[in-house]
Amino acid sequence: MASYPCHQHASAFDQAARSRGHNNRRTALRPRRQQKATEVRLEQKMPTLLRVYIDGPHGMGKTTTTQLLVALGSRDDIVYVPEPMTYWRVLGASETIANIYTTQHRLDQGEISAGDAAVVMTSAQITMGMPYAVTDAVLAPHIGGEAGSSHAPPPALTLIFDRHPIAALLCYPAARYLMGSMTPQAVLAFVALIPPTLPGTNIVLGALPEDRHIDRLAKRQRPGERLDLAMLAAIRRVYGLLANTVRYLQGGGSWREDWGQLSGAAVPPQGAEPQSNAGPRPHIGDTLFTLFRAPELLAPNGDLYNVFAWALDVLAKRLRPMHVFILDYDQSPAGCRDALLQLTSGMVQTHVTTPGSIPTICDLARTFAREMGEAN
């Protein structure tokens, strides 16, 4: 091919431009790195925040324990974010919890089909999850990097949440799937909506023998609830799988690599109590991933459809960074409180992002409690 002078000049020009561009990029990166380092140093001077999410199956004693712990602190350094009961009963929909239990009862009695139940349950679960998801989004801009737990000074503020968004967007939908009143596709739709896990997400799950759990649940009075032992077994199973899933992921487990180890057999209704990170990495069959080897999610070749596989990638990404703690509820309320207080000493704090973040977060939490807390 002929060589033309204009091509030669263009080539030389391109080389010079690339060389200058490379040097310019290196020069431009220096102030960016310096700016980033400055931002990190400034953040490290910001006050710290401790966020604790008390979660697990209903009826263990979470709310009582949390309220006793909050009572130990002053109004300015510890704030309780309750369940959004008013939203569930009035603001978001009418008597959502009662609607859920009634729908499950009607399905169990053969009065409605599984498809009809799934429509109601999916709609109700959207209502259950909305306050958690939107509050997480409003809080997120104020959460900086993790400050660690070892020898950390007391946080400027401790937020105690009655549940994390995964309760409404993962655990209870998964339990309803085990109960036959929600489809696996709907469960994964909720999974796709789980907000990104913020730094310093400390989640406290509970352990309590099943007979003691049944006794406590039978004695409590919550508007709209029924004593549904099958649902209790299902939600206990799901939270056990959740704890295992976090351990599995943090231990280096990859659901894509281990998918072939799943048998596709039905998930047993009962399992061991949640465990801390001690011990060997759980088998994938003892994690939440086992729920999703369902025929409805599989292509003709037996593989997951990609859209569902991507949802499981989201699940892994959301659960892996969580700091999970296990609280033994098989003791007195005061004993539970003291055990929870001891757990907080090993939890991970975060720096806030602005000097005004702490009062803003306090206002957010108190507004949530005032507007959406327990209905009168």
From Swiss-Prot:
Keyword hit for Nucleotide-binding: yes
**Record region (Disordered):** 1-38
Q: Which residues bind substrate?
A: Y101, Q125, R222
Query: Which residues does the annotation say bind ATP?
Result: G56, P57, H58, G59, M60, G61, K62, T63, R216
Residue positions of the active site: E83 (proton acceptor)
Please name every pair of cysteines joined by a disulfide bond in this record. Answer: none
- UniProt xrefs under SUPFAM superfamilies: P-loop containing nucleoside triphosphate hydrolases
Catalysed reaction(s) here are: thymidine + ATP = dTMP + ADP + H(+)
The source's superkingdom equals: Viruses
The annotated regions of Basic residues compositional bias extend over 19-35
State the practical use: Used in molecular biology as a selectable marker to identify transfected eukaryotic cells. Used in cancer suicide gene therapy to selectively kill transformed cells.
What's a GO biological-process term for it? Answer: TMP biosynthetic process
The enzyme's first-digit EC class, named in words, is transferase
- Tell me one GO molecular function of this protein: ATP binding
| Gene3D superfamilies noted in UniProt | P-loop containing nucleotide triphosphate hydrolases (3.40.50.300)
**EC number of this enzyme:** 2.7.1.21
Q: Recite the UniProt keywords alphabetically.
A: ATP-binding, DNA synthesis, Early protein, Kinase, Nucleotide-binding, Transferase
Stated role: Catalyzes the transfer of the gamma-phospho group of ATP to thymidine to generate dTMP in the salvage pathway of pyrimidine synthesis. The dTMP serves as a substrate for DNA polymerase during viral DNA replication. Allows the virus to be reactivated and to grow in non-proliferative cells lacking a high concentration of phosphorylated nucleic acid precursors.
Which family is it part of?
A: Belongs to the herpesviridae thymidine kinase family.
Other comments on record: Phosphorylates and thereby activates certain drugs like acyclovir (ACV), valacyclovir, and famciclovir to a toxic form, that leads to successful suppression of the infection, while the uninfected cell does not have this ability because it lacks TK. Mutations in thymidine kinase may induce HSV resistance to antiviral therapies in immunocompromised patients. The most frequently observed resistant strains are unable to express TK and are avirulent in animal models of disease.
Subunit structure, as described in the record: Homodimer.
Instruction: Please identify the protein, giving its name as recorded.
Output: Thymidine kinase
